[in-house]
């Protein structure tokens, strides 16, 4: 993937085909689970935080943690929340302005996550990453050690790219979007599953916003060029990712032996239904 750190060689799927195998892994079987939530799920069109969805997400993840799973949350939204905080409706083009908005928004995001998770007696930790750190062995090892210690303490890491310190000189050396970041994080923390929450309920064989006959694809065994062509265009005005970046993340996770699910983030019960084996979203098993 252009600009993304290389997968951990120890976790690639060498020797395994694209279809199910006797050792096939599903997201529902994961003990360590990475959940990625996007800006369009966390905020309204005006950029303000969707407190209901955010509270539902924190309650659901807290309950899954109580049930014995270990959770890592990759959260977009710093720039979008910063826009809402400062009353901006249009995402700026200038790198410096986006960095400033990320600095404002990240504070607000972590305040809310600390508040909502704290209501269910869970502690969160902020982890801000840059690609140049995790793409070198020493930096990668340090990040892996941090995740291991946080998870062993029962802490829920909340991860984002450190947009504030990314500069033009580092362009091409960044993650590019938080879908990619979530797949990288899944490899770093030894996850057995990646769940990407988005504003539609999976991958469709057409654009469901334009084609009422478009059908959801419940399961994708191999991410072929034909499958990638279904992903369409860019993301929302408030975020950087669209379905194409989510497919790339699923592909990167698959290369590390990690199954992925792309599901709607609109309802708090959807992760429960997914992990109980119900037919929701689109699954990418390994």
What are the residue ranges of the model-derived segments?
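C-terminal catalytic "cap/lid" subdomain
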Residues: 8-11, 20-286
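Intrinsic, low-complexity polybasic segments
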Residues: 2-8, 16
């Amino acid at each position: 993937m252009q600009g993304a750190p290389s997968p951990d060689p120890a976790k690639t799927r060498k020797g395994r085909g694209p279809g199910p195998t006797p050792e096939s892994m599903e997201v529902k079987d994961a003990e360590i689970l990475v959940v990625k939530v996007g800006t369009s799920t966390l905020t309204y069109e005006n950029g303000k935080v969707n407190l209901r969805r955010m509270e539902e997400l924190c309650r659901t993840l807290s309950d899954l943690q109580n049930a014995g799973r270990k959770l890592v949350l990759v959260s977009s939204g710093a720039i979008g929340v910063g826009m809402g905080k400062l009353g901006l409706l249009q995402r700026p083009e200038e790198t410096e302005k986006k960095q400033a908005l990320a600095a404002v928004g990240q504070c607000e995001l972590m305040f809310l996550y600390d508040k909502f998770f704290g209501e269910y007696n869970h502690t969160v930790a902020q982890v801000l990453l840059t690609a140049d750190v995790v793409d070198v062995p020493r930096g990668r090892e340090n990040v892996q050690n941090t995740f291991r210690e946080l998870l062993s303490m029962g802490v829920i890491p909340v991860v984002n790219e450190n947009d504030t310190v990314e500069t033009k000189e580092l362009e091409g050396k960044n993650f590019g979007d938080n879908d990619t970041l979530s797949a990288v994080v899944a490899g770093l923390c030894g996850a057995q599953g990646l769940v990407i929450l988005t504003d539609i309920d999976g991958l469709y064989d057409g654009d469901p916003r334009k084609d009422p006959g478009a059908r959801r694809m419940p399961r994708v065994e191999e991410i072929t060029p034909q499958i990638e062509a279904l992903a369409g265009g860019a993301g929302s005005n408030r975020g950087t990712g669209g379905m194409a970046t989510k497919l790339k993340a699923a592909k990167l996770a698959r290369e590390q032996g990690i199954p992925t699910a792309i599901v709607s983030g609109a309802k708090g019960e959807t992760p429960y239904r997914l992990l109980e084996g119900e037919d929701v979203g689109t699954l990418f098993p390994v």
